[in-house]
Amino acid sequence: MSNIEERVIKVIAEQLNVDEGQVKADAHFIDDLGADSLDLVELVMTLEKEFDCEIPDEEAEKITTVQSAIDFVKSR
């Protein structure tokens, strides 16, 4: 697992208040990790701060799983 993946998983676990063991690549934020729309907004803001990047709204809407978050951060 890369450093980026580890950091994304840690951010997601902390932001959604779940154990890092639950944060699997195919986990869906809402269906699997119990997030709501406010959680997702806060998660995007935290990822932007942690990785010093901007996530446009149209891209943020596509980030629905752990893997999609990892892929987005890696692409920046």
Curated annotation (Swiss-Prot):
Keywords: Cytoplasm, Fatty acid biosynthesis, Fatty acid metabolism, Lipid biosynthesis, Lipid metabolism, Phosphopantetheine, Phosphoprotein. The keyword Zinc does not apply. Signal peptide: none annotated. The keyword Cell membrane does not apply. It comes from the Bacteria. The modification O-(pantetheine 4'-phosphoryl)serine is found at S37. Residues 2-76 form the Carrier domain. One of its GO terms (molecular function) is acyl binding. 4'-phosphopantetheine is transferred from CoA to a specific serine of apo-ACP by AcpS. This modification is essential for activity because fatty acids are bound in thioester linkage to the sulfhydryl of the prosthetic group. PROSITE patterns: CARRIER, PHOSPHOPANTETHEINE. Its main location: cytoplasm. Gene3D superfamilies: ACP-like (1.10.1200.10). Pathway: Lipid metabolism; fatty acid biosynthesis. It is found in: Cytoplasm. Pfam families: PP-binding. InterPro entries: ACP, ACP-like_sf, PP-bd_ACP, Ppantetheine_attach_site. GO terms for cellular component: cytosol; membrane. One of its GO terms (biological process) is lipid A biosynthetic process. Belongs to the acyl carrier protein (ACP) family. Carrier of the growing fatty acid chain in fatty acid biosynthesis. This is Acyl carrier protein. The lineage of its organism: Bacteria, Pseudomonadati, Pseudomonadota, Gammaproteobacteria, Cardiobacteriales.
